[in-house]
A protein has these predicted regions:
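A conserved pocket-lining segment of Rossmann-fold NAD(P)-dependent short-chain dehydrogenase/reductase
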Residues: 56-77
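Conserved catalytic Lys-bearing alpha helix of Rossmann-like short-chain dehydrogenase/reductases
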Residues: 14-22
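Glycine/proline-rich active-site loop of Rossmann-fold NAD(P)-dependent oxidoreductases
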Residues: 42-55, 89-99, 122
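Terminal hydrophobic/aromatic helix or amphipathic segment near a protein terminus
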Residues: 108, 112-168
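Glycine-rich Rossmann NAD(P)(H)-binding loop
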Residues: 68-72, 99-106, 116
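Conserved beta-loop-beta element that borders a ligand/cofactor-binding pocket
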Residues: 23-46
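Conserved Rossmann-fold NAD(P)-dependent oxidoreductase catalytic core, especially the SDR/UDP-sugar
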Residues: 1-14, 33
Length: 169
């Protein structure tokens, strides 16, 4: 609430609103569970993995001797773990309950080392912390790009700098 994320990011606002609506249906006869899921790894037949976007971003750094990325980190799950959480919540929920689900907590630096090993076989790619102001400047470029294509992003690219710099686990 202090960061006013719902005001800045339509995606976050919609998730909060969805939870509020879902909880209205909970009563003594029907439990309602909301799973608060972080980044999910795995594939879904017929769908492009979300992480393809990250790979495309990292390829922009190929000609540089290092990669710049925010200092923070995030929680992560596998598709299988999400399935297990769904079953557990469905079997156990009473009333209205939100479950924050996580298995792996990694800094962006730790995570990118794994990605580079998988992507290029590079075990020691240098990762440099991107200052928040640089990330915000890139966010302004992205805002202009979105506007030129008449795209409304769910996460404000300038405000994303506040989130990406935090260890969200």
């Amino acid at each position: 609430p202090d960061m006013k994320l719902c005001e800045k990011h339509p995606y976050i606002r919609s998730r909060v609103e969805q939870e509020e609506v879902a909880f209205k249906y909970a009563d003594d006869d029907m439990g309602v569970a909301v799973l608060e899921l972080p980044y999910i790894f795995g594939t879904q037949p017929g769908r492009r993995p979300v992480w393809v976007i990250l790979i495309e971003q990292l390829q922009r750094f190929k000609k540089m001797p290092f990669t710049m990325y925010p200092k923070g980190g995030t929680a992560m799950l596998t598709v299988r773990q999400v399935g297990e959480a769904i079953v557990g919540a469905a079997e156990q929920v009473k009333g209205a309950r939100a479950y924050g689900i996580s298995c792996y907590n990694l800094t962006w630096r730790e995570f990118l080392k794994i990605v580079y090993r998988a992507m290029d076989g590079i075990p020691d790619r240098k990762i440099v912390d991107c200052p928040k102001v640089f990330f915000q400047m890139f966010g302004h470029v992205m805002r202009k790009d979105y506007a030129s294509r008449n795209v409304e992003g769910g996460i404000d690219p300038v405000g994303l700098a506040d989130i990406m710099g935090m260890e969200l686990f």
